């Protein structure tokens, strides 16, 4: 008889949809342990602008995979998959259920489907590409990518240096294009996954929550948090940490490119766009149960039933 795979729960959703509150309430009721699935919460010293759970919330419900990196460091979907599976196995060994909570859809996809066998980052080649970008401009590098990998060039915008650099780096390391390599899937996830997504039914309610959240961030000292990061000589706006929504716009403000009101406006707009992308991902997601942000009791009951019926 085949041994039953361990249960894991995914709680996905757009930014500001109430995922964290729901996860904390579920943990108070059931033996679940929370793993964060968020490419911004991984960074230390980035608490306010990421809406990281506060000390009180973390005391009630510790989150794994937050505050694990300095903002100067990069973290890939492959890094996340390795770390998340390690934490999931530890949680199961403790006799508990992994509850993965967040909105970084690429991380969930990597976890479920595995990853293509892409080469590890090569700092020397990255520096070489960065030097070329300064000398020739990103458009010239995009033209280069179009010649070797037109499919990736169609997908990657010339103003997206992070992805453009990675596509060129992969080719220079391996001699194969990103398109070739991503057609090969990795290992699937050795868990039985029940997947849920939470969001308000009305888009205007999500927009209201996003605006309110940004206002609260400013009141809580987001500008001072940003100034501390801006003062560091090892940080710059091309880093994944500073490219996070909100941080990118506040960096522009500190650079003198706009005033604070404009930075807040841009930050809210960028957050709305992020939420729209997250919802687009989720609408095409298979085997997903939707929960209503405005009916937390019902959402909690649905999650409770999923655990109790297993």
Swiss-Prot record:
It holds the Pfam family IPPT. Substrate binds at residues 15-20. ATP binds at residues 13-20. Residues 38-41, 162-166, 243-248, 276-283 are annotated as: Interaction with substrate tRNA. The keyword Isomerase does not apply. Its cofactor is Mg(2+). It catalyses: adenosine(37) in tRNA + dimethylallyl diphosphate = N(6)-dimethylallyladenosine(37) in tRNA + diphosphate. GO terms for molecular function: ATP binding; tRNA dimethylallyltransferase activity. One of its GO terms (biological process) is tRNA modification. Keywords: ATP-binding, Magnesium, Nucleotide-binding, Transferase, tRNA processing. The record marks 104, 126 as: Interaction with substrate tRNA. NCBIfam families: miaA. Catalyzes the transfer of a dimethylallyl group onto the adenine at position 37 in tRNAs that read codons beginning with uridine, leading to the formation of N6-(dimethylallyl)adenosine (i(6)A). Monomer. Belongs to the IPP transferase family. This is tRNA dimethylallyltransferase. It comes from Vibrio atlanticus (strain LGP32).
């Amino acid at each position: 008889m085949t041994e039953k795979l361990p249960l894991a729960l995914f709680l996905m959703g757009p930014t500001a949809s109430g995922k964290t509150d729901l996860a904390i309430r579920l943990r108070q009721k059931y033996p679940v342990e929370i793993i964060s699935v968020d490419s911004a919460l991984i960074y230390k010293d980035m608490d306010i602008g990421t809406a990281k759970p506060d000390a009180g919330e973390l005391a009630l419900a510790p989150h794994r995979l937050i505050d694990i990196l300095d903002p100067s460091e990069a973290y890939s979907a492959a890094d996340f998959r390795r770390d998340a599976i390690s934490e999931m196995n530890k949680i199961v060994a403790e006799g508990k259920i992994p509850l993965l909570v967040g909105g970084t859809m690429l991380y969930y996809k990597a976890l479920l489907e595995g990853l293509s066998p892409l080469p590890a980052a090569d700092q020397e080649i990255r520096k070489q590409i960065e030097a070329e970008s300064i000398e020739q401009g990103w458009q010239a590098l995009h033209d280069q990518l179009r010649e070797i990998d037109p499919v990736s060039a169609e997908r990657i915008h010339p103003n997206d240096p992070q992805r453009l650099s990675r596509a060129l780096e992969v080719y220079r390391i391996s001699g194969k294009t990103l398109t070739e390599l991503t057609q090969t899937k990795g290992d699937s996830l050795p868990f039985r996954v029940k997947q849920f997504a939470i969001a308000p039914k009305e888009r205007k309610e999500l927009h209201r929550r996003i605006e309110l959240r940004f206002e609260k961030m400013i009141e809580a000292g987001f500008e001072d948090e940003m100034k501390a990061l801006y003062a560091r000589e090892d940080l710059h706006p091309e880093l994944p940490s500073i490219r996070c929504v909100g941080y990118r716009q506040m960096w522009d403000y500190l650079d003198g490119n706009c005033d604070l009101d404009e930075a807040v406006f841009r930050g809210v707009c960028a957050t709305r766009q992020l939420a729209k992308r997250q919802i687009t991902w989720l609408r095409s997601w298979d085997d997903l149960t939707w929960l209503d942000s405005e009916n937390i009791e019902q959402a909690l009951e649905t999650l409770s039933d999923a655990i109790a019926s297993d």
